[in-house]
Every structure is written in C-alpha cells, then in structure tokens.
Amino acid sequence: MLFIIASLLALLCIIWLVVRGFANAFRFFADWLSDGEKLEDKESGVTAPATATTATTTATTPATATATTPATAANPTAKNRVVAIFSYPEKIHSTKAKRESYLDAMHMGWYQVVILFVAGSMAGLLLEEIWMLITAGLTESRVGLVWGPFSPLYGAGAVLLTLISYQLRRRHAPNVVVFCISAVVGGLLEEITGWGMLTFFHMQSWTYAFLPDHITEFVAWRFLFFWGLLGLMWCRFVMPRALYHIGEPTSKRQAIFITLISLYLVADIGMTVACFMRATARDVGIPPQNTFEQWVDMHYSNEFISARFQNLSTGVEKAK
C-alpha cells in the first residue's frame, strides 16, 4: 500500500514538473515573440510599446493627440492597454476593471481569431477525449484535420462565440438573450457541419437520430441547452479574460508567427478536404485523375482515414 501511494505521489510530481516545464517554455516563447522590432502604430505613426510599463512613459505628440479616439479620450491609458502586451504577472492578477477597460478600447482582428481557433480546436479536442474516456471508456482519436491535434468544429465555435459575445457585451445584452443566441448559433454550427459532411462527402462524425429529443439528425434539444449555457459562461467569464490575455500584436515576430500559423491551417484544412474528396471517390470506384490525386491516394489511403478519424463513418447515404 505504501509503495502504491509513493508511486502515485511520484507520478503526480512528474506530471507537475512536465506541466510546469511546458508552461515555462510557452511563457519564454511568448516573451520572445513580443520582443524584437515593433510594429508601427497605425493611428499615431509611432512604434507600439512592448509592455504597459514602457507604454505609459511614451511622450504624447501633437500627431497622437489628433488621432485620439473617443475611447482613449475618456481614458488616456486605454490606447496603451490596446497596443501593449502586458507583463505575465499583471495578466495573471488582472482585475475586472482592467479587463473591461481593455475590451472597451480594443478591436477584434485576425490575430485574435487565429489564436482563438487554434486554442479552441485543441482544448475542445482534449475535453472531448476526456469526456469519452469518462462516459464510455473509449480512447479513440477525435481529431478533425489530417495534421495536428485539432478539432475545427470547436475552433469555429470558439471564434463564433467570441465574436458574438463581444458584440452582445457592447450592447449590454441580458443573460437570457446571450443564452438563446448562443444556443441558436451552436445548433446552426452543428447542423451545417453535419449536413455538409453527409451531403458532399457521404461521411458522418455524429448523429442524434437515436435520441428522443432530437430535432434533426445533427441537432438535439439537450445539446442546444449546453450550447446556450456554454455561450453564457463564455460571454461572462471566458471571453473577457481570453481577449485580455491574447492582447494585440506589438512586434513583427508576432505578426509573422500568426501569419505562418494561418498558412498552416489553410493547408491543413485544404488537405483534409482533398483527402475526404478522394475517399468519397474511391468508395464509388473513381480512379485518380492527376498526379496530386495519385499522391493523396498513396499517402492518405482508406486505412489512414480510418485510423486517423476513428469516429468517422464513411460511405453513409443521406436519408431521403
């Protein structure tokens, strides 16, 4: 018994050290990205400061004064909060007032969208894997793309919920409105994704047809409730902290890194679509028509599809 307890404690220590190591590596990489040559400030034409500390010491010129927006006029440091990547301790111990002030001044862009998509895709995949392990005892691959640990449905959901929550927050929408809109958006996302996969690729990753409360094959009332609850929590708790921690790009390294990630995601999604199209064509006996399709058949065969997308059913016919 003592040996078992000691082994568990040792395992927990190893896990803690690994997690801490990854966290430190991530922090180091994030700090490295924020260093280097700074991006030019779009409004004032001056270099954006790297930290909030240096941002507050930047002298104000007549040019910057004329470019001041209403948000920054009401709060002179709002602009600094937008362009600055805050120091790690300040982000961790941020207050609600700081986050709200930052959200009032920031502008959503491609930088935030890409980070949210990647984080949502990976976090959603991890949570689904854990959920399947706890509820069904299954340890199957639930990825949605041929390269990398990504589930694009969760990534798209994170982006949509953030964009919608951001606008609802600006309009001071009540909780019931946030809940209903989030439920509708989540249901539409599931319906469009499921219908598109079945219609164009004859593939199916999930079905609610066996549930008594299903609305369509891909939408059920219980999951609309979960989408609404998730959207409400996202709007009130997750979104403000996520956008505050992501910040806005201040260095060329950050801009280049996000551009490379974007190109990788485009290639990953494009290759996944190509693999699904060839899998559908192979099922009906259509041979490859060009060198690229031959290469896809050679490297992404039906065996690869089955092993990679273990929850995916192929050759499914749409119900009439």
Can you say where each PLM-predicted feature lies in the sequence?
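Aromatic-rich, lipid-facing transmembrane alpha helices and their immediate juxtamembrane interface loops
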Residues: M1-A52, T69-K320
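Low-complexity tandem-repeat tracts in intrinsically disordered regions
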Residues: A52-P70
